[in-house]
Amino acid sequence: MIEDTTGMLEQYTGSLTDSIQKEYLIDEKFYQGDVKRGLRNSDGTGVLVGVTKVGSVQGYFMQDGQRVPAPGKLYYRGIELTEIVEAHRKADTFGFEEVAYLLLMGYLPTRGELNHFNDIMNRARKLPDGFTESMIMRHPSRNIMNELERSILSLYSYDPEPDNIEIDNILMQSVRLIGYFPSIIANAYAVKRHYFDGDSLHIHFPVENLSTAENFLRMMRPDKSYTDEEAKLLDMMLMVHAEHGGGNNSTFVCRALSSSGTDTYSAIAGAVGSLKGPLHGGANAKVMEMFRYVKENVDPHDDGSIKDYLNKMLDREAGDRSGKLYGLGHAVYTMSDPRAVLLKKYARHMAEIKGYAEEFDLLQKVEELGIPLIQERRKSDAPMCANVDMYSGLVYTMLGIPEDVFTPLFASARIAGWCANRIEEVVTCHRIMRPAYRAVTIRGKYVPMEERTVSKAL
C-alpha cells in the first residue's frame, strides 16, 4: 500500500518543498538577545535546567565569567570513571554490572550485593516467550536502532503494570531493560542479516553466569566464540558509555518525557530515538566513514599527505563534503575526553593482536594533525580534543562488531544511565518540563475560501 502512494506523494511534496522551506525559515535577528538556541548559553555552555547526583562531566571551570580549560573528568555517582575502569583492569574483572548497580542504586555494592544483582541480571536477560518470533522476526528492520525502539515499546504489552511509576516498579523495569537490550540487539541484527542480506539465521540465547559483554559477543557470533581479552575490552566500552550527565541529548529527552508522568518504555524509546541521530550516538559510524576516506587517499607515513587531505575535507572538497572532521571537539571537554584517553590506552594491544596497528596509528595522526587545522580555521587557540567517537568505532571493528550495531551497542550501555536519570527525575522533579518559544509570526486575518489566491507553489 505504501508503494502504491509513494509516487503520488513524492510529486505532491516535491512541488511544495521550496514554499515550505520559505515559510519555516526564521530570520537570524530573532535569535539575538535572550534566546537560548539549542539550550546553549552565549559562551557555548549548556543552560542549567536541573541538578543531579547520577553523573557529571567536567571539561572546564569558570573564572571571572570565563571558561578555563581543564583536563576532562567523568564521574559516576561522584566516583571518577577512570578510577573505576583502572580498578577493574587491575583486578582483571568485568565492571559493567557494577557500574549499572552504582548508577541505579547510588552506591558501590558489596560482594554479596553485586552477586545478588548479577543473579537477577542473569534471569532478566531472557526475553519474554515468543518475543523474538512475534516482534523481531515478523517485522524485520534494516536499522537496528529502529528495531530496538519498536521492541521497547512492544515490551509495554508484556508488562502487567506498565504505567505504574512507583519507584520499585520503575527499578524492576529498569533492570529488565538493561538485561533485555543485548538480546534484542543481537537478535535484531541476526534477523536483519537473514532477511535483507541473505545470510543464514543464527539466534543464540543468553547464558547465565556470563557478563553482559561475554553474552553479547556470544550472541553476535555464529560460532559463539570469543576471547577473554575481547570481552574485557567490550566491557570497558560499556563502562565508558554508561552515563554522561543529565544534559546530553538522549538523557535529557528521557528526563523530559519522564517529567510528563509517562511510562518507562515510552521514556526509554524516546531516548533511543535521540541516540540514533548522527549528531549524537551515530557519530561513531561517521568517524569510521571519514577514516575510510582518509585511508584510501593518503600516505599514512607522510604527515603532509594527511594534512592536505584533511584540509580538503574541511574545504568540503573530499570525504562526505560536510566540512567536518568527525570525532574532534566536544561541547564540554576541552583538553581531553577521559573516555577517549581510556580507549587509546587499552585498545592499542588489541589493535596489534588483530592486525589494526596501522589503522590505530593513522587515526592518532588524524587527531594530532586535524585539531591544529580546525583551530587555524577558527582563528582560535582554544584547546580541542578527540572525543570518544574518534576511537570507539575502530574498537568495535577490531571486535568484529558491524557498523549497524555501533550505536545500538552504545544504547546497551547508556540504558543504565537513562534508567538512573529517569528514576531521579520521577523522585525529585514534580513539574513537567515546559520551556518557552517566542512567536515571531506576522499576525493576519482568516480569509474566506473564495477570496484566497492560488499558492505560488502550485
Regions found by a protein language model. Name each.
Residues 1-458:
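Non-transmembrane, aqueous-exposed alpha-helical and coiled segments at domain scale
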